[in-house]
């Protein structure tokens, strides 16, 4: 007998499309076989395309076994080199995951300054970032494009311009775990030097892959051992992984550590789905679903959004709203087969709920996931009156 499966509407992992789910159910392939090399070659090329980077820019994609968090370690270990000329990092924090990135950087020896918004649920004012850049010399600025703890969306284009005008030598680093695939993202145009994401959110693949893209400028820095010294890491070393990725993209098998072949096969299908639909259309679909869902909760049910809504500070792949009794609402939805998430921000965690709307739940309007979720939240709140 088949057991019914709950509708998963947390901010990742997300519900997979039928084709992506099916791509997991394939026999194991040799990781240097012609069949797998062809798949991985396409994945690397399409990864660059989804980040909006041209091959001519000589940006380098990396797809490794691991979670999105591994991306922090990859950047930190290849930036904080033994002879790194500038270990100062400005972290633009809009929530829990921004702060965790800062903790990761400190663990490698970075000198970290953190700039925060005036109020939880808002983005950091651009003038505060510019002021910090004017006062201090930073080797890198990190921005969490969408902080999943608050559903705050940062304006990468504006921050990029501020860095270029105030401190052009500073690396621009973006945690795009909850934005690639659902938010406008322009790696080349915005001058991003290092961007990291994961497979299980808006990309629409299973959890288990850490996906990064490095600019040629950052690659020149990270690979220069004679000038900048050795890497404080082994698995995370770009010096070890770069020839592997270059060979796979050139259609040649290579080996450093065994890649998860089934996960990469499913990522291949997920990336093709995104590109076949079109990035701009996909961004629009996420925006439309997000606006409808937030408007229904904020204006329809008179709930307060954690991220300011309506505004350009509110993410399109998830919604965070304050409710009187989050555990009760979460339990009620669970009893009806819908799984949502609670809050995790250290200051407001017990006060709000989070709902993900990425991938098929946002892009396929024939599926009733979000309408059902809204109806259940409405019922849960009416029960408490």
Curated annotation (Swiss-Prot):
Chain positions with N6-(pyridoxal phosphate)lysine modification: 201
InterPro entries membership: Aminotrans_V_dom, PyrdxlP-dep_Trfase, PyrdxlP-dep_Trfase_major, PyrdxlP-dep_Trfase_small, SP_NH2Trfase/AEP_transaminase
BP-aspect Gene Ontology terms: glycine biosynthetic process, by transamination of glyoxylate
Residues that bind substrate: 354
GO CC annotations on file: cytosol; mitochondrion; peroxisome
Pathway connected to this protein: Amino-acid biosynthesis; glycine biosynthesis; glycine from glyoxylate: step 1/1
Necessary cofactors: pyridoxal 5'-phosphate
Phenotype seen when the gene is deleted: Alanine:glyoxylate aminotransferase activity is reduced by 98% relative to wild-type.
Uppermost EC category: transferase
KW Transferase (keyword) present: yes
Disulphide-bonded residues: none
Additional record remark: Present with 339 molecules/cell in log phase SD medium. Expression levels higher in stationary phase than in exponential growth phase when grown in complex medium with glucose.
Family: Belongs to the class-V pyridoxal-phosphate-dependent aminotransferase family.
Functional summary from the UniProt entry: Has alanine:glyoxylate aminotransferase activity.
Entry protein name: Alanine--glyoxylate aminotransferase 1
Phylogenetic lineage: Eukaryota, Fungi, Dikarya, Ascomycota, Saccharomycotina
């Amino acid at each position: 007998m088949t057991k019914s499966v709950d509708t998963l509407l947390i901010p990742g992992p997300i519900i997979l499309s039928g084709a992506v789910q099916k791509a997991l159910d394939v026999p194991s392939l040799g990781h240097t076989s012609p069949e797998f090399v062809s798949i991985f070659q396409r994945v690397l090329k399409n990864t660059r395309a989804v980040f909006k980077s041209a091959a001519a820019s000589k940006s380098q994609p990396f797809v490794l076994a691991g979670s999105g968090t591994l991306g922090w370690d990859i950047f930190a270990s290849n930036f904080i080199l033994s002879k790194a000329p500038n270990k100062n990092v400005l972290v633009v924090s809009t929530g829990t995951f921004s702060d965790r990135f800062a903790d990761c950087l400190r663990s490698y020896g970075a000198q970290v300054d953190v700039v925060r918004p005036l109020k939880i649920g808002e983005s950091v004012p651009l003038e505060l970032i510019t002021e910090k850049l004017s006062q201090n010399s930073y080797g890198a600025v990190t921005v969490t494009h969408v902080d999943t703890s608050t559903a705050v969306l940062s304006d990468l284009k504006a921050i990029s311009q501020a860095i270029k005008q105030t401190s052009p030598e500073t690396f621009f680093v973006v945690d795009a775990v909850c934005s690639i695939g659902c938010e406008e993202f322009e790696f080349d145009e915005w001058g991003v030097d290092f961007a990291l994401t994961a497979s299980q959110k808006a990309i629409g693949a299973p959890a288990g892959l850490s996906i990064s893209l490095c600019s040629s400028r950052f690659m020149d820095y990270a690979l220069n051992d004679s000038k900048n010294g050795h890497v404080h890491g082994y698995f995370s070393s770009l010096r070890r992984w770069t020839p592997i990725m270059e060979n796979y993209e050139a259609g040649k098998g290579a080996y450093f550590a065994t890649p998860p072949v089934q996960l990469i096969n499913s990522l291949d299908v997920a990336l093709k789905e995104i590109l076949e639909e079109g990035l701009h259309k996909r961004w629009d679909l996420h925006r439309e679903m997000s606006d409808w869902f937030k408007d229904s909760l904020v204006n329809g049910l008179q709930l307060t959004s954690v991220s300011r809504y309506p505004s350009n500070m509110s993410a399109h792949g998830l919604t965070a709203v304050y409710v009187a009794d989050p555990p009760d609402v979460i339990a009620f939805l669970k009893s009806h087969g819908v799984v949502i998430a609670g809050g995790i921000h250290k200051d407001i965690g017990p006060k709000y709920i989070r709902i993900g709307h990425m991938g098929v739940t946002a892009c396929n309007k024939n599926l009733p996931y979000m309408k059902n979720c809204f109806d259940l939240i409405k019922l849960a709140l009416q029960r408490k009156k």
